[in-house]
Amino acid sequence: MLLKKEPAYRKTEKEDFPLIREFIRRNYKDRWEFEEAHTEKRLTRLLFYTYMISRDKVTVATYRDQVVGVLITGKGSHGHFAPFFRLKKGYHFLRLKLTREGRKNLEHFNKLQDMKKQLTVSQENPAPGNILFLYVSKDYRRNGIGTGLLKQ
């Protein structure tokens, strides 16, 4: 879809969190298979809370008052003191541990976390910030929204 006007970029608000979780779900839906819907929901929330703990900045792109893209950046391995997000992450981690499918998907999640740690510890590429998550809705891709989010 060709946009008639430029999208607006702003900091995220609490009302945007359900839509950000939906973007995370859409991003990983094609990569992981779920037999049960609650496993997909819990893993999505676990990823969301992990991102929110280690976030530095969360920016959303809006077009016609609709959120069409999100960028979550973080600095290193030092997260925010976010007790709410940490408690929710622990809760969903435990709920996933209780099911066979959840344990299988947690293995993939742990591999992702290990790769992320290796990239942040690497001395060859010291970066001031990391992109934790970047997503633009499929209908709005190829319009420079991702580039605009990165420039913010």
Q: What is each PLM-predicted segment?
A:
Residues P7-E22, E33:
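A short beta-loop-alpha structural element at the N-terminal edge
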Residues L2-L3, F133-K138:
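Terminal substrate-recognition subdomain of acyl/acetyltransferases
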Residues D56, P126, I131:
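Short coil/loop residues immediately preceding or within conserved phosphate-binding loops
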Residues E22-H38, T50, K75-H78:
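Helix-loop element at the rim of GNAT/NAT acetyltransferase active sites that forms part
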Residues V136, R142-Q152:
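Conserved acetyl-CoA-binding loop-helix of GNAT-fold acetyltransferases
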Residues A37-V58, Y63-R64, I72, T120:
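Active-site rim helix/loop that mediates acceptor-substrate recognition in acyltransferases
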Residues S77-P128:
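Conserved acyl-donor/pantetheine-binding loop and adjacent beta-alpha core of acyl/acetyltransferases
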